[in-house]
């Protein structure tokens, strides 16, 4: 039996530094075949502002609990309009193309869940969860829908919905706080 070394692909891990494992060539081919079918189904998504019909399947595939999907969808719609390439302060057209910057005050907010730079940028936070746990230490990987959902899941498992709840952000955000949610 011939051994093949595989690691995470750039599509799945972006900048992650994954350890390599020795497996059989047959297993490597089967894994790649499965990855190719997953990748092609997600690459076929045409993202449109306001449309998250694709989100359930992708979120479940990366590990989100089914009972959290309705709230996740509401947060994705509020934060990015369902546009995975969106950065904080950007204005997008109906096809999720960034057409201008309305403000430059929060450009570290990234992707579907508008994950803030304190979660990935060690120059802002030496305990940056995503950098330490997933080797996501820059904004670019978070502009991929699947990666953003995986990162958001880690944040949610660590902090619950707090990072996306304006009721927990302090008095200056009280106007954005919806009681009972």
Language model feature labels by segment:
Residues 71, 86-87, 94, 108-181:
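Catalytic and binding regions of secreted/periplasmic enzymes and modules that target cell-wall glycans
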Residues 80-102:
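Conserved alpha-helical segments that form or flank metal/cofactor-binding pockets of metalloenzymes
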Residues 1-2, 13-83:
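Export/targeting segments at the very N-terminus of extracytoplasmic proteins
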Residues 74, 101-104, 154:
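Short basic/hydrophobic patches in alpha-helices and adjacent helix-turn junctions
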Residues 60-63, 97, 153-156:
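N-terminal cationic-hydrophobic initiation segments that often serve targeting/anchoring roles
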Residues 7-9:
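Core subunits and conserved enzymes of cellular information-processing
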Residues 40-46, 57-62, 101-102, 134-145:
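Second-shell loop/turn segments in exported
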């Amino acid at each position: 039996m011939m051994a093949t070394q595989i690691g995470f692909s750039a599509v799945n891990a972006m900048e992650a530094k994954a350890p390599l494992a020795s497996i059989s060539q047959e297993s490597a081919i089967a894994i790649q075949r499965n990855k190719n079918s997953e990748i092609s189904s997600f690459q076929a998504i045409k993202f449109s502002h306001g449309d998250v019909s694709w989100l359930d399947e992708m979120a479940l595939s990366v590990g989100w609990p089914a009972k959290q999907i309705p709230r996740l969808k509401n947060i994705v719609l509020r934060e990015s309009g369902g546009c995975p390439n969106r950065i904080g302060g950007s204005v997008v057209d109906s096809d999720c193309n960034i057409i201008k910057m309305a403000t430059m005050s929060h450009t570290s907010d990234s992707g579907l869940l508008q994950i803030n730079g304190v979660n990935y940028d060690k120059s802002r936070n030496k305990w940056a969860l995503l950098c330490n746990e997933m080797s996501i230490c820059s904004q670019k990987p978070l502009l991929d829908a699947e990666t953003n959902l995986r990162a958001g899941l880690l944040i949610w498992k660590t902090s619950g919905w707090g990072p996306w709840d304006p009721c927990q952000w302090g008095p200056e955000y009280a106007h954005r706080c919806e009681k009972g949610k």
